[in-house]
């Protein structure tokens, strides 16, 4: 095959994929119903609906952080609920109990089994931020850090959330 003919064949093979990195297919109805179910379970477990709040899940070199805030800064009751929730999950995670995320997501969340096994080497520190709270998760144990990153990656994906750096700041 000549070089020009080879280019035409190659372009013909690549044409269907050109631009595919630019567009994201719409979620399937099943994915949307699964997302809706997760949001409904989350509203019960977390005490605040996902549509009224924003989540950020950041990987950091020594672990990560969860930032959870109300979209409406005037919703002080919601902010109080978030603060109580993040402190509660920090306390639960510290003793190896990850029932909250399992209940919200309907599965054992990736990373949590290893985080439970390595709980003695993981620190959890919650503090208030405007309209919500942040839970900082840190460790010096590389296996624990990998588990924390797996946990946070799943959270970003399932909540359709960005990292904190890309969150909308009201």
Feature roles, as predicted:
Residues 1-4:
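N-terminal secretory signal peptides that target proteins for export/translocation
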Residues 7-17:
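Bacterial N-terminal signal peptides
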Residues 19-170:
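Intrinsically disordered, low-complexity terminal tails/loops enriched in metal-binding residues
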């Amino acid at each position: 095959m000549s070089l020009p003919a080879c280019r035409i064949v190659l372009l013909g093979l690549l044409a269907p994929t050109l631009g595919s990195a630019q567009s994201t297919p719409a979620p399937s109805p099943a994915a949307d119903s699964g997302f809706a179910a997760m949001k409904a379970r989350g509203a019960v477990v977390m005490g605040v609906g996902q549509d009224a709040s924003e989540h950020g899940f950041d990987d950091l070199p020594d672990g990560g952080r969860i930032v959870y805030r109300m979209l409406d800064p005037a919703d002080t009751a919601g902010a109080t609920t978030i603060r109580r929730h993040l402190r509660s999950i920090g306390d639960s995670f510290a003793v190896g109990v990850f029932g909250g995320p399992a209940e919200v997501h309907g599965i054992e969340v990736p990373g949590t089994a290893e985080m439970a096994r390595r709980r003695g080497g993981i620190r959890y520190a919650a503090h208030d931020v405007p309209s919500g709270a942040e839970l900082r998760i840190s460790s010096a144990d590389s296996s624990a850090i990998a588990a924390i990153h797996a946990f946070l990656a799943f959270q970003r994906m399932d909540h359709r959330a960005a990292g904190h750096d890309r969150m909308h700041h009201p």
